[in-house]
Each structure stands twice: as C-alpha cells, then as structure tokens.
Amino acid sequence: MPAMRLHELLARTGLDTRNLPDIDIAGLSTDSRQVQPGDLFIGLPGTRVDGSEFWPQAIAGGAAGLVISENARGVEAAVPVIRVPDVVGTCARLASAYYDFPARKLTLAGVTGTNGKTTTTHLIENLLQAQAPTGLVGTLYSRWPGQSQEARHTTPFALEIQKLLAQMVEAGCQYGVMEVSSHALAQQRVAGCRFEAAVFTNLTQDHLDFHPDMESYFQAKATLFSPEYRSGRAVINADDPWGVRLAAAYDQVWTYSFQPGADIYPEDAVFTPEGIRGTLVTPVGRAAFTSPLVGQFNLANLLAAVGATLALGIDLEAIAAGLSGFGGVPGRMERVSGSDDDIAVIVDYAHTPDGLRKLLEATRPFVRGRLICVFGCGGDRDRTKRPQMGRIAAELSDLPVVTSDNPRTENPEAILDDILAGIPVGVSPTVEVDRRRAILQALLEAKAGDCVVIAGKGHEDYQILGTTKIHFDDREQAREALSKRRSRG
C-alpha cells in the first residue's frame, strides 16, 4: 500500500484530527516488534498486558504515530498520539479505511458455528468459484486464485483480514467467504465487514476456556447476524436448539434441516461409502444432487452451503451440479488408507464432544470389523469436555485409544486422566501418551476389516509440547504405520 496521510486516515475512520500534524503513514502495526519506519502503531489490549505499554519499542522501531487507550499513562512521545476509548474497534476501522474499505468491494459470505465451518466455507467457495473469482479466509489458509497463505487463526486479526480482503480485490475477486469464529466476533476482528449471507452451523461445547459459559458463547456467535455485520440473508440450522433460538430472533432467515418444514431440506437422502445422493428442496425449487462427501454431518454442511449460495443469487441447478465436484477438505474425514489395505484409516479434525460423536456416527455404518478411535484433548483448553469425549469414544467405538493431542504446558498424563474419568467401568481403552506410538500401535494391532479413526488434529502438521511446536502430521504418521503393516505381510 502507498503511504496515506494521517488526517485522511483519521477522517475516514471518524476520528478527530485537530491538534495533530498531517504526516505520511506508511502502514499499520499492532506488534511493536514488527513496526516498520513510518507505521502507525496501535496498542491493542491483551489478556495479560496492554499493548499501549509497548509504545517505547514501537517508537524505537520507527513508528510515526501511536493509537493508544485513553487510559494509558506515562506516554510522552514526540510523534502524534491518538487516544481512543475503544482501541480494538478503532483498530478494525483504521484497517478498513487504510486498505480502502475492501469488504465493500466484495460480496461476502460468513460462516459461524462450533463444527462444520471449514467444510461449509470450502463448499461455498467451490460453488462460487464456478461463477466468479472467489477468496477464502479460514482455519487452513487464506486463498484466492493464484495465491494461498497458511492461516495462524481461524479468523485473522483485523489488520490481517483487511489486508487479505484488499489483496483479493486487487486479484479480481468478486466474492469472499470467511470462517467467523466466536473469538473474532468477541474481539471485533471482522468489524468493517458486512455479509450478504451469514450461516450458523451449530453450537456445542467448545472454547469455554475463553467464554464464561454457553450463553456467552452463543451471544458471541449471534453477533454475526446483527445489522452491524449482516446485510443479507441468514441461513440457520434448525436441527440445533441454539439455531432455533437464533432463527426466531431475526428476520430474513432461511432455515435448513434434515426434516421437512425447514426452508431447505433433503428428500430421499441415501448415504453410502461413496457419498450422498438425494433431492434438495429449497425456497426456489427442487433439484437432484450427488456428493462424494460422506456422512450425515456432511449433508448438514452441504445444506448450509446450498442456502448461502442461493442467498447470493446463484442458480439452484448450477449449485446442484457443482456439489458433485467437491471432494472434501484436507483433514476432514480424509481417508489415508489405500484400496489395497485390509483396514480403513481416516484422519479428522474432530476435537469437540459433538464433533467426535458425529464423526464416529458417520463412520460406523461403513465399518465391517471394529471401529477404533485414536484421540486426545488439547492442553490449556476447556477441561470439562475431556471426560465427555472419553465417554463418547467408549460409547461409539469398539476400542478407544487415548493419547496426547497438543498438551501445551499441561502435564500430558493429567490430560489423559481427565479423559479416562469419562470412560465407564468395564470398557478397557488403550492408553499411550505418545501420539506417534499410539497411532502405530492402533494400526498394527487392527484386524482386517477394522476402521481406525484418528481424531483431533486433522490438517495440522504440528504438535505443541510445552511451549515448543514440533512437526507432526497424523496423516504422515498413519501412512508410515500402514507401510510397516504392509511390510510385515
């Protein structure tokens, strides 16, 4: 981006320019360690430290100005200092203005919910891409035609979002599709974005280390459907009790469900190991469809994507035809085993109680032998879901294999103990704290016809042990284990 004059930037954001020199601003930064000469440094509040405290480091890095809390004390700088009551909201507005309001130049679809966001956004992206250039922001990456960038968060922070959207506009994109997390909504990361289609997939237990309770979690998700963020239709899962509540609170809503009575639902759905087929019933008509996606939860994702793309004006027949060409998302019900293997191995990102339940329920009908579930729970995260996941694995699989996920700074053995507390007496799980060994053991001990589901990490290619991130990919580990299984004959 070329430099922008400070007065123009502040005026675009609705901030007072009086008593401030009109200087060139070369960029925006919220990290004092990465400030470049000429940047406007924005001191965001953190969970432990207020970013305003790092103004000396920002000045040392060449910051041309500071945006800090009106309550910050001891700031005596020779550069313009802009004090605001809400640094987080101001940051989002400054970012939008600096990048020339890119969200206004795209037709946006946003998807929120505990589970299903990634598959649903990829489905929407795939369907829209057939109509016009489309960008995607999500858990795996941010991408648009000719470009892909690895993601650090499900929804990036405000500066990064606006920069990504500006790059999409520059690349000629007409549509943008975004996973919108509850963290992002609570932290105003998507301020400045208004969505022509806003999707709610479901709400189940997760992130209670961040939100005080499920009601707070719901209210954060519901923000996406407020007039501040939504300019078009809401597409809401009516099979979810939180979705029913959400749909009743807003207008311009289409509901989707497995049952007739919703605005969008399937008729005569057939599930096979090769995918799903049936008929879509929608407010604009009916259409036969086939999809290579597997399982009932993927049918829900498909219905959500159909609703979103219909809301954006895409023709139903084009949508139905496009569904057959979407083969899935990396690390989501991803089959790692080959057709010559005598066992099936599936890697999936399921890391919540509901996600694990849906994964195992979707897999069970196609298993000839035993269903073996390798899983763990992340450290420094919601502890209450651990025994729930242990209980679900014991209930829905034939052999739970309890192991580590990302222990982070917690004792891995203590995490396993929390999981094991939910496994009923009489069930004998395999317990192996080392995830590599757990995967190897599960695959080597599986019998012909068994299916091994490795849950929790999906697309991730790392494991966090303490504060160290090491390379670790469930798919690679599974392929190595399969190779050893084949070599022993």
UniProtKB/Swiss-Prot annotation:
HAMAP family: MurE. This is UDP-N-acetylmuramoyl-L-alanyl-D-glutamate--2,6-diaminopimelate ligase. Catalyzes the addition of meso-diaminopimelic acid to the nucleotide precursor UDP-N-acetylmuramoyl-L-alanyl-D-glutamate (UMAG) in the biosynthesis of bacterial cell-wall peptidoglycan. GO terms for molecular function: ATP binding; magnesium ion binding; UDP-N-acetylmuramoylalanyl-D-glutamate-2,6-diaminopimelate ligase activity. UDP-N-acetyl-alpha-D-muramoyl-L-alanyl-D-glutamate binds at S32, T154, T155, S181, Q187, R189. It comes from the Bacteria. GO terms for biological process: cell division; cell wall organization; peptidoglycan biosynthetic process; regulation of cell shape. The keyword Signal does not apply. Meso-2,6-diaminopimelate binds at R381, D405, N406, P407, R408, G456, E460. InterPro entries: Mur-like_cat_sf, Mur_ligase_C, Mur_ligase_C_dom_sf, Mur_ligase_cen, Mur_ligase_N, MurE/MurF_N, UDP-N-AcMur-Glu-dNH2Pim_ligase. It catalyses: UDP-N-acetyl-alpha-D-muramoyl-L-alanyl-D-glutamate + meso-2,6-diaminopimelate + ATP = UDP-N-acetyl-alpha-D-muramoyl-L-alanyl-gamma-D-glutamyl-meso-2,6-diaminopimelate + ADP + phosphate + H(+). The gene is murE. The lineage of its organism: Bacteria, Bacillati, Cyanobacteriota, Cyanophyceae, Gloeobacterales. Pathway: Cell wall biogenesis; peptidoglycan biosynthesis. Its cofactor is Mg(2+). It is an enzyme of class 6 (ligase).
